[in-house]
Amino acid sequence: MSNFSVFLIALLFCSVFILSEAQIYTSKECNGSSECYSHCEGITGKRSGKCINKKCYCYR
């Protein structure tokens, strides 16, 4: 049981680290996620962006 819990904690830690690397913060202000699509396409080459707290976040 202890080996499984160590494995689970390691998996969780690695997942959080990988996900944080995939997110790119930009200083562009927005009111909705649709405003971030063209901006993120210029940065990452993909139209994957989200408006969080009136700032655009792009994803790789």
Curated annotation (Swiss-Prot):
Expressed by the venom gland. The record marks 50 as: Basic residue of the functional dyad. It comes from the Eukaryota. Keywords: Disulfide bond, Ion channel impairing toxin, Neurotoxin, Potassium channel impairing toxin, Secreted, Signal, Toxin, Voltage-gated potassium channel impairing toxin. Gene3D superfamilies: Knottin, scorpion toxin-like. The record marks 59 as: Aromatic residue of the functional dyad. GO terms for molecular function: ion channel inhibitor activity; potassium channel regulator activity; toxin activity. One of its GO terms (cellular component) is extracellular region. Disulfide bonds join 30-51, 36-56, 40-58. InterPro entries: Scorpion_toxin-like_sf, Scorpion_toxinS_K_inh. It is found in: Secreted. Residues 1-22 form the signal peptide. Recombinant toxin selectively inhibits Kv1.3/KCNA3 potassium channels with an IC(50) of 91 pM. Belongs to the short scorpion toxin superfamily. Potassium channel inhibitor family. This is Potassium channel toxin ImKTx88. It comes from Isometrus maculatus (Lesser brown scorpion). The lineage of its organism: Eukaryota, Metazoa, Ecdysozoa, Arthropoda, Chelicerata.
